[in-house]
């Protein structure tokens, strides 16, 4: 019963926050918000410059690898557990998947900035 209540409250809160995030920006629509702030001067160019696709892919790759490294942080705490073999195997599998992902990105030339 408690688990059902926790899930219900979490779903309601998530739905409420998502709806607020979609409705709130639509209240004050005017072009001044789309301009960059340049210390009171008129903007020299558009505020909505497109990102390079290479930059975007490198940034996403960095975030994925950073998240996978964060999964290894509890490893030092888990060494104190009585069944260390399972934790060692799990961490080895995680590092192997991380290394395979890095090798795949390297072979696909996803880490090269210049083409």
UniProtKB/Swiss-Prot annotation:
Protein EC: 7.1.1.2
Main location: mitochondrion
Subcellular location: Mitochondrion membrane
GO cellular component: mitochondrial membrane; NADH dehydrogenase complex
Topology within the bilayer: Multi-pass membrane protein
Family: Belongs to the complex I subunit 3 family.
Protein's name in the database: NADH-ubiquinone oxidoreductase chain 3
Species of the source: Onychomys leucogaster
């Amino acid at each position: 019963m408690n688990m059902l209540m926790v899930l219900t409250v979490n779903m309601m809160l998530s739905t409420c926050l998502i709806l607020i995030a979609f409705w709130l920006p639509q209240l004050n629509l005017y072009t001044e918000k789309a301009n960059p702030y340049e210390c009171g001067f008129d903007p020299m160019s558009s505020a909505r410059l497109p990102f390079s696709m290479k930059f975007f892919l490198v940034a996403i790759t960095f975030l994925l690898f950073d998240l996978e490294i964060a999964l290894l942080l509890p490893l030092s705490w888990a060494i104190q557990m009585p069944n260390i073999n399972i934790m060692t195997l799990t961490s080895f599998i995680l590092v192997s998947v991380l290394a395979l992902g890095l090798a795949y990105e390297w072979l696909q030339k996803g880490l090269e900035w210049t083409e």
